A protein has these predicted regions:
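Short, basic, alpha-helical segments at the C-terminal edge of helix-turn-helix-like DNA-binding modules
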Residues: 58-64
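Amphipathic C-terminal alpha-helical segment
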Residues: 91, 108-111, 148-167, 179-185
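Amphipathic alpha-helical packing segments from all-alpha helical-bundle domains
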Residues: 65, 94-103, 111-137, 145, ...
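Solvent-exposed, amphipathic alpha-helical segments
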Residues: 9, 13-21, 67-70, 105, ...
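N-terminal intrinsically disordered/low-complexity leader segments
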Residues: 1-5, 185-189
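Helix-turn-helix
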Residues: 6-9, 13-51, 55
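Hydrophobic alpha-helical connector segments
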Residues: 55, 66-99, 143-147
């Protein structure tokens, strides 16, 4: 197994531990067991718990970017903006898991500064994705922060709902936000 294969294997194992057991239970030993590797074999590629955590966050960002690229390719016009932003909402099990992990990083980074870089990486990725979406509709760059706040707020509310609860209201709210951006662009006053 080459280094890239090992990194991928360990990153995916770390992701499974994160989603199953939570951030506070993530350890080199647990990830090694999940990957079916002896802990000593991770010594060079993932020497610390922080490096394992960073690999899991990188995997999250990579998966998100892949889905966003697919959405953008499928709809390279203004409808792509909606498709891209919908990828940021926990509307299925995969996106719900991603959001649960992200929220745990937010909460725990408030008291553990070592978690801040991982949180910042995920936060900046979402901000960048919002910028990509708004670029498709010709919205002003100043609207990125507002859109990021809207998407984060909708995502948190969806996460707080019981699994399987209707999510149509959040999609309608996102559509209303995009309509307001379009109206603002048409009539900037």
């Amino acid at each position: 197994m080459d280094v890239d294969d090992r990194r991928r294997l360990v990153s995916e194992a770390a992701w499974r531990v994160l989603t199953r057991d939570g951030l506070t239970e993530l350890s080199v030993r647990k990830v090694a067991a999940e990957a079916g590797l002896p802990p000593s074999s991770l010594r060079y590629t993932f020497p610390t718990q922080a490096s394992v955590r960073d690999a899991a966050v990188s995997l999250l960002v990579d998966r998100l970017n892949t889905r966003v690229a697919q959405a953008r390719h499928a709809a390279p016009d203004s409808s792509g903006a909606r498709a891209i932003l919908l990828e940021l909402l926990p509307l299925d099990a995969e996106r719900r898991s991603e959001m649960e992990v992200t929220v745990s990083f937010i909460a725990l980074s408030m008291t553990d500064a070592s978690l801040r870089p991982a949180h910042d990486k995920a936060h900046n990725a979402v901000r960048g994705i919002c910028a990509q979406a708004l670029e498709l509709i010709g919205a002003e760059p100043t609207q990125v922060q507002l859109t990021h706040a809207v998407v984060d707020g909708l995502a948190l509310h969806l996460l707080g709902q019981a699994i399987g609860s209707p999510a149509g209201w959040a999609i309608q709210a996102l559509d209303a936000h995009l309509e307001q951006l379009h109206a603002h662009r048409s009539d900037p006053r």
